[in-house]
Structures are given as C-alpha cells and as structure tokens.
C-alpha cells in the first residue's frame, strides 16, 4: 500500500494505516515541462523562457489552447441563446444586420480557432442586432457617461455580462469607447435602428449603444443624448409610496442635488428643499422620497388652530431655527427622523388663545399615542423679557394627560417664581394630583435670574403636589 492511498480494497488483513488523500496538484507550465524544466504556472506566463518556442510539442499545446477557447466561446453563445429564449414574443423583432461589435467578435473568434476545431464544430450563426436590444429592453438604461470605463463591445464576455448580470450591464451601458462612438455615427447603425415591428408598442426607440428603451405602464422614457428625443418623452414619472413626480430628463448628472430638487418640486421653497436635503445627508433619492411621502399627509393641514401649539404674533423664540421650515408639520414624512409632531404646528394667528409664549393643547379629536418630552433650550430666547428660566424646560405631552383633563382653553405654562408656590386649583381641573401636567425645571447648577413678578402672592395657594409643579390659573 502506497502513501497516497490504494485504489484497491485488500480483503486479506487489516489495514495498517488509514489511506491518505493525495495532495492538491499545483499547475505547472506545460512548455517548460516539454523542455525538462519544472515551473509553477502562477505568474509565470509572461516570463516563460519557451513562450515563443515552435517545436512540435509547443505547437501542439497552442492548438490545444485554441480548441479550449473555441469551446468556451460556444458555451457562452449557448448560454446567451437560452437567455434570449426567455424574452417574450412581444419584445422580439425582425432579424436585421448584425452590429459592428458582433461582426468584429465573430471575426476574432474565427481567426483564433484552428482548422481542426472548425472542422469538428459547426460555425456559429451571427446574432441579430435586435436580440441584444430586446434583452436590454427589460431594464432601464442610465445616461451614458463616456470615459468612465473603457468598455469593449467586441468582446463576447462583455456581451454575456450584459445579458446575464444586470449590475455589470449597467456599468457597460454607461461607458463607451471612442471606437464605439465612431461606429455609432456610421450609417449602418442608423439603418439597424429601424428594425422593429410596428406591433410591439412597448419598444419606443433604440439609443446609440443598440439598446431599446421600454415604455412601462404608459411612462414614456427617452435618453437625453438620443437624436430621436421628443418633447412628449422628456419626463420620467417616478412613483413614490404616496404619489408620483415627473423627473425631467434634461437634468445632468453633474448638477447639484439642490438644483435637481428645484426642478422636480418647483412649488416648494428653495430654503425648505435645502433643509430637507441637509436632513437627508445630501442624499437626493431620500429627499425625493421625503417630499413624495409628504404629499399624502397634505389633507391633515386643514386642522384648526385650537388643536396646535400656537406662537404669538410677536414670537421670536424660534425665528432663527424654525423660520425656514414649512408652517404645517404634515409636510414632513411619517418615517422621517426630523418629523415635527402633529400637535406642534406654528401659526401666526394667536387671537383666540392666551397670549403666553408657550401654549400646549390638552384636547384632541382622537386619542394620540404618548410622545417623548420636547426639550426647549433657553438659548432660543433673544431678549431678556422671556419668561424662560436659564434652565431647560421639559414639556410633557402624554396620553394620560390628554384623556384625564378634557380642557379647551387651559394651557400649561412655565412661571418664574420659587419652586414651593403653586397656583390655585382651577374649578375645571379635577382634584387628582397624581398625574398633573407639569413643567419640570431641574435646578442643576444654573443660577435663577430674579425677574419681576406679574401676579401677587394672594393669587397662589399651596397644594399637596410635587415642589416643581406649576399650573396657571387663567380662569381666576
């Protein structure tokens, strides 16, 4: 029994040691082996001493390599034909003259194959130009950008990648070499464009690379560089989760995203578009999705001012931060991280509410889920007459608060007095004190600025509640 394992099973005695698997064979250079030299093949082909040898054994190796190349080309062609058989009959067209790329590929394959391989294998029929066009009609081809990647259309492996792999097909469609540009300007290619049957309405036109642009569901698409560019095909309809938007094809890839948004949404203010684009991190697609999803909630903008947070006409608190935002919070996406809650909408009409700088609604037409507290920094105030203390003001807007106190004109407001005094309880408020609406003012090292008191001490009354709760009695 040898050390590499025996191919036979001996029945006589027990096996002394388990059979060992043979080691993996490392490929060697066949030309060097013909001349008695052992050379590993990896990285050796360029530096082989016998690469130009014309002896009988080396010529046999050359013929064998040509046969293998012809077999690989035949397998690729069969794979392409099996892919083309999956194309529906509505996308098939009349056969036309082969494009220059396929003609060059066929000539290159024929020149590489040996006479022995040509006799053993049938000749490959030339593929019509419309087969590639019909296969490419199944997807939308992006705008070509010459010079990004020098693609060789004459190579058969690139043709296989176009039909098989969609990602590499898009990259090949975006890049064309100078040679292909000259071929596209020839009259033969112009003749090959008019080889579609009139009974296939899905195919609109063929662009310069031999691709067909498909019309999906009545949405006309056209390539901006095509000479057959019509006015009725100048827009691409993009369907979002809640609406559609018309994207003009005249937009170039090197335009800034803000200019693209201005072209798509001309009714929106440029400042709003800029803020949404910054909120999406400069991503144009995310900004378009946010603006599309905001259209579905446009009907919610008809709510009255009593159900919203109202800023007075002389309000200056949110001027420099929220001055560019849209008035209604329903313009924001439902899934956006920058969404303003539905109960916080800013309006210039403050005639029907208490003229406090902060007015919080306590009644809604339907129960809403609990929200996280809204932190308002005191750095938003500009003048010294602001009722905010130097501490943070935490505004709690919970579901329990809305259900327990069904009020119409009672609003919670911060008041700059000491932390032990509270307001006299309103006759409308219930006597339950466990879940009162409160504004907690944590005293965490910031000095309290003494301000002139608006109310007298007779208007206040101590009540069994936490020391940091304050309720404004507007009915007294």
UniProtKB/Swiss-Prot annotation:
Sequence ranges of Polar residues compositional bias: 418-432
Claim: Transcription regulation is one of the keywords in the record: yes
Localization per Swiss-Prot or TrEMBL: Nucleus
**Transmembrane feature ranges:** none
Q: Which residues bind DNA?
A: 29-76
Signal peptide (from-to) = none
List the GO molecular function terms: DNA-binding transcription factor activity, RNA polymerase II-specific; metal ion binding; RNA polymerase II cis-regulatory region sequence-specific DNA binding; sequence-specific DNA binding; sequence-specific double-stranded DNA binding
Superkingdom field: Eukaryota
Main localization (coarse): nucleus
Q: Enumerate the InterPro entries for this protein.
A: DM_DNA-bd, DM_DNA-bd_sf, DMA, DMRT, UBA-like_sf
Q: What SUPFAM superfamilies does its record include? A: Cysteine-rich DNA binding domain, (DM domain) (SSF82927), UBA-like (SSF46934)
Q: Where is the composition biased (Basic and acidic residues)?
A: 176-185
State a GO cellular component annotated for this protein: nucleus
Domain DMA, which positions? 255-290
Q: Which keywords fit this entry according to its UniProt record?
A: Developmental protein, Differentiation, DNA-binding, Metal-binding, Nucleus, Sexual differentiation, Transcription, Transcription regulation, Zinc
One GO term under biological process is: adult walking behavior
Where are the stretches annotated Disordered? 89-130, 147-195, 418-476
Quote additional remarks: DMRT3 is a marker for a subset of spinal cord neurons (dI6).
Domain remark from Swiss-Prot or TrEMBL:
DMA domain interacts with ubiquitin.
User: What does this protein do, in the record's words?
Assistant: Probable transcription factor that plays a role in configuring the spinal circuits controlling stride in vertebrates. Involved in neuronal specification within a specific subdivision of spinal cord neurons and in the development of a coordinated locomotor network controlling limb movements. May regulate transcription during sexual development.
- What is the similarity comment for this entry? Belongs to the DMRT family.
Name of the protein in its database record: Doublesex and mab-3 related transcription factor 3
